Each structure stands twice: as C-alpha cells, then as structure tokens.
Amino acid sequence: VTDTTEIDSALADLGRGEKLWADTPLSARREVLERVHTLIGEHAEEWVAAAASFKKLSPDSPLIGEEWMSGPYPALAGAAALIGTMRKLEAGTSPIDGVRITDAPGGRLAIQALPHGIFDTLLLNGFSAQVWLQPGVDAASARRSAGLGQRTPAATQGIGVVLGAGNITSIAPLDTLYDIYANNRVVALKLNPITDAMFPVFNKVFAPLIDLDVVRILTGGADVGTYLVNHDAVSHVHITGSAITHDAIVFGTGELGEQRKADRKPLLGKPISSELGGVSPTIVLPGKWSKADLKFQAKHVATQRLHNGGYNCVASQAVVVSSSWPQKEAFLEALRDAIDQAPERPAYYPGSDGRVKAAYDVHPEAERLGPSGGRVLIEGLIAGRDEPLLRTEYFAPVLGVVELPYEGQEFADKAVDFANDELAGTLGANIVAHPATIKSLGDSFDTLIERLRYGTIAVNAWTGVGFLTAHASWGAFPGHTVDDVQSGIGLVHNGFLLDGVERTVVRGPFRPAPRSILTGQFALTPKPPWFVDNRTAATTGRRLTNFTASPGWSKLPAIFASALRG
C-alpha cells in the first residue's frame, strides 16, 4: 500500500522526469520503447503466471490462453506499433505514409489498421480493421496530424495519472504507453488492487521508463487514488473502469455528488479521459444458416459474453434477434448449449455473484446455466420497457435476448435504432450476418454500420478483436461529456497516433477454416484462439506472444499447427 509520502516522492520524480523527457529526441524515445518491448517478451511467462494467480486459473487450463492473448500479446503488439510510428516520425514522414486509405460512408476516410504487413495477413487471415476518421477529415490533414504529441516532443504535457483496470492485464500498460507517446505526458500508473499481483512484472517491463523518471507505478485503495488524482502536481487523469467510479472521481459521492453532477460543477479540477464499458449489443441479422453455422455463431456469441469470465467492458450483454426468424429457436438452443458447456472458471471479480443474483432476482424465470448455475440467460426481453439489463452493465456472466418483430431490412434498421437509443454506452457493437444477407442488403449494410454510434463495430467478429488490433482505435463513440459520460471520453491504442478518429470497424469471416474455404469464403483462420471453448488456446496464445516478441517465418508452422487443433 502506498502512503502519501511515497506518492509525493513519486510525483516529484516524475516532475524531474518530465523536464528530461522534453529534451529526449525521437530516436531515444523509440529506443526506450524497444527496450520495453524486449522486456515484455522476456517476462511474458511471469506476466501470465501472475494474471492466472489472481484470476484463480489452473496452470494447465486452456483458459490460460486468454491471459496470453489479452496480456503480453497485445502489449507487445501495441509497443511494436508505436515503434513503427516513431520510426516514421524520425524519418520525417507521416505514420500513415504507405498505409491504405479508402473512402467510408458519409464523407469519411478509412485508414487500414489490419492487416498491417504480411504476418497479419497470414495469422489473422480473413480479418480486417479500419479506423474511420470523423466526417470532413481529408487525407492531407490526416497525414499531417498523425503522430499527435510526438510531432512536438519538447512540448510535454505534465504528469498524467492512469488508473488501471482490474480485469484485462494489458490495459494499464497500454494506457500508460499511450499517455506517454500520444499525449506526451509522464505517467503515474495506479494499479487496481485486484491486479496488485502484476506489480513486480510491470516494474520489470517498464524499467527503462522508470529509470528515466517517466513512469512510476503505485498501489493502494481508493484513498490512494483520491489523493493522487487531486494532487496539484497532476495535470490529467485517465481511468478504465465504470461510470460510477468515474462520477465519484469527478463529482464526489452521495447526494452532494449527484447534485454537483446535475449542476455540472465537478470537484476534479483537471481534464479526465476514460473507457467505461456499457451494455454492448450483438445484432443477429436473420438469414438461412446451416447447422454448423448455428453452432459456430452460438459459440461466438457465448465467447463475447463469457471471455475472461464475463468481466470485459465490451462483453456482449444484449443479443438482438428477429422474432420472426425461422431459425431463431434453433439459434437460441445452440446459444444455451454454448453458454452451458463453456469451461467452468472461478468468479474472481469482486461483486460478481451479487450482480448475477440481482439479474436473476429481476427475472426469476431466467435460465441458470453452466456447471454451477452461475451464468444467467434471460430470453424474451422486449424493447421499450423499463428493463435493467438494457441500462445496467452487469460486468458478470449475464446475457439477455431481445426480440424485435421485424424482418429483413426493417429488422436491421430497427435493431440499429434500438442499440443506439435504448442501450447504455457506446463502446462496442457486434453484428452477425450470413455473407448472403450482407450481399442482399448491398450499400444499405454499410449505412447500418455508419448509423451505429459505437467506438468499435465488429461484423462477424467480436469487438474484442478491435482491442487486440494495435493500430486500431479503442474507446467510446465521440461526443460524451463528464456529466453524461456513458462509455467514456477519448481513446487509446491507436498505433498510428491518428487525430480526428471516430471509430474502428472490424470484419471477420462468418465461418472458420476449413469450412469457410469449402463454402466459397476465402478465409484461412480456424476457430480463433479467444473462443472460450478453444482446446489449444494456451499453446496458441503462448506461441503468438513469442512470435510478436520476435517475429520470424520459422515460428509460423507451430502457430498454425496449434491453431488448427483448437
């Protein structure tokens, strides 16, 4: 536990570090990031073991794959993306020189974030991601502004506090690197107490930045966080967590806090950015699916809810289906089975059991699924009613099914309206659609994507893929304010350091290989390693991480061999 004296000392160190960082050239900034990248690779095993310890996972569980894929793997990819951007800036060119730029709906530009290079094409074949810029941003201005704070490295922006997340272990490191390189701040990283087990390994991987007094890592409870964010030496705060925690920081708690929020009079006297989750939808467009399609996509949706035990800010919580879809019941039966049969794991996140009980108390008719009955599936929800599931992020294995009485294009339009208007938050939305359905909708399908007000939209993929894509942006849809924060303000990741970002759009294959190839969809990716029922996820995740630490052609066959057995 950190006391106020230690905090004062850490902030004094960072104050000195900021002055030195302002004089540090781009080449040296890149070199220190390369050392961090190397250290993440060297300590990846320790990183995963620490994560497994506080999540109470057995060392031989396939679920360890989640810790590789959401821990050192994206941290390595994020550092590598920033290194590439720094190299471009050093050379006097734009980070997006040579990157594919295309038109997107509504007068927008789309910057290709995935694939970025031949290895992406091979390892995530069939997946793509684009960063859509805000309407009116042209290619010339996008190129000029890419690089953000590293375009004027001497103009540092003070000390930033990063309040780390308690669920995914790459979030705090990635947010820290983003604040340093995008925003040109030095950083006091305060860990969520749930993740205190990560303190030793984080100190090791950040050692090059700690030695320069650019980073300090602190632990402690809410009292430490409160003292830290309100400290006069701190110029900015970034939090990953809940809107409730955000509002407590900005306005205080209790009736006084609520009154300050209503009056738009924050207690926090400095800017704050945030990533806060919400109620994420999965819109299932009706079509003619095979039995294998129904089973695979049911496992896909179950993964969107149950990955990391259900403790993800972008976990799906509301599945939206057409009540008149002939295959609705078959899909829901497959979804029940997928949720019920997913591997058992401990409920490590505080308050999870209480949140599951709260959902069940509202809907005692709901199904209790899983080996211990700890997962709740609530069917038959109706749009337009006062339904807690649509307004409350449960952050637990709770999934609702909303039925809309429409078909075809009308269903698609109404589902987008429902997601935009009735669900809390704007972090991520998923769409599942047969390729023939997408083709039949034509240009109107792109209009559906444009109309969804979400920071990441995934078509036949989980929005979590956007989180894993280092060059993609990650954050809420733009426009929220501190008194109506919803899923947050600002963004992170964004490996090209783009300005004027609106959203990321991810696309994936409707079917895994080899079935995708046999049915005419050229995508070579088998069942993804982030699926909760993937039997070789731990091996694949470890091999992908080792590859990302030190890429090489000779490492690819072993990755493919493991992935194909999943």
Where are these regions (language model features)?
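N-terminal Rossmann-like NAD(P)+-binding subdomain of aldehyde/semialdehyde dehydrogenases
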Residues: 1-142, 179, 192-193, 205-210, ...
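PLP-dependent aminotransferase-like
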Residues: 159, 171-223
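Active-site proximal loops enriched in glycine and acidic residues that flank catalytic Cys/His/Asp
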Residues: 164, 191-193, 219, 238-241, ...
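Hydrophobic/aromatic ligand-binding patch that stacks against planar heteroaromatic rings
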Residues: 178-179, 228, 418, 448
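Short gly/pro/ser/thr-enriched loop/turn and capping motifs at secondary-structure boundaries
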Residues: 195-197, 244-247, 279-282, 464-468
